[in-house]
Amino acid sequence: MSHQADNKLTLRRDGFTFKQFFVAHDRCAMKVGTDGILLGAWAPLSSVTRILDIGSGSGLLALMLAQRSDTHVRIDAVELDSAASQQAKENISASPWADRIAVYAEDIIDFADTRSADYSLIISNPPYFPPGIACGSAEREQARYTTLLTHETLLRCAHQLLMPDGLFCVVLPIQVAENFIPLAQQHNWYVHQQLRVSEQEDKPAHRVLLALSRQKKECVNASLAIRDEERRYSTAFQQLTKDFYLFM
């Protein structure tokens, strides 16, 4: 039996195994998924010195950015849910970057009110559904719905904490982004980069990754298909995520 097959048989079932770290997510309302992995692999890191992950959940984005960034870069992860923040701490403690990432179990509004604008990159995989159909648990509803963290609050807190030349990166469903972008512009944000993601080359985009700036810059637009027309992972998707996916 091949070494790769051996690895497949021993993968843990309570989380997600990446090439350089493991993310347990059994105590988190929102599990590791393609949206977060795309955002963590794509977010621009040029000249980054300090990073903030808002709504960190299991710590996925903080860990991905720690792997991608220089050793001097420090990362703060803020997560309101106590069970998720504890699991993020455990995931980070077990990773190679435990000394570079700090987890804060608090509301981002309170966090922003006690910090200065010294983050060069802020990243978030935010809730995107308005209150509606129940999710089955209060924790999952908190993670999925904008009840506790509205997009307006998210934009305001990020604006408060970001350095003037920094970037704020999010991933959203296309339909949600259609409302999010005008709202961001009302709060003095400018779209600097935009990656429209489709599930397959012949399908319309269903997600968008945004890099917002406090300064007006030329917007760079791009697109990415996760799979080709034969349902294989596309070359572009493999290139973007190959440092993370175990068998990519």
UniProtKB/Swiss-Prot annotation:
Signal peptide: none
GO cellular component, one term: cytoplasm
Gene Ontology biological process terms in this record: methylation; tRNA processing
Subcellular location: Cytoplasm
This protein's UniProt keywords: Cytoplasm, Methyltransferase, S-adenosyl-L-methionine, Transferase, tRNA processing
InterPro entries named in the record: DNA_methylase_N6_adenine_CS, SAM-dependent_MTases_sf, Small_mtfrase_dom, tRNA_Adenine-N(6)_MTase, tRNA_adenine-N6_MeTrfase
Entry's transmembrane regions: none
GO MF annotations in UniProt: nucleic acid binding; tRNA (adenine-N6)-methyltransferase activity
Catalytic activity reported: adenosine(37) in tRNA1(Val) + S-adenosyl-L-methionine = N(6)-methyladenosine(37) in tRNA1(Val) + S-adenosyl-L-homocysteine + H(+)
EC number: 2.1.1.223
HAMAP family: tRNA_methyltr_YfiC
Family the UniProt entry places it in: Belongs to the methyltransferase superfamily. tRNA (adenine-N(6)-)-methyltransferase family.
PANTHER family reported in the protein's UniProt record: TRNA1(VAL) (ADENINE(37)-N6)-METHYLTRANSFERASE
Protein task: Specifically methylates the adenine in position 37 of tRNA(1)(Val) (anticodon cmo5UAC).
The protein, known as: tRNA1(Val) (adenine(37)-N6)-methyltransferase
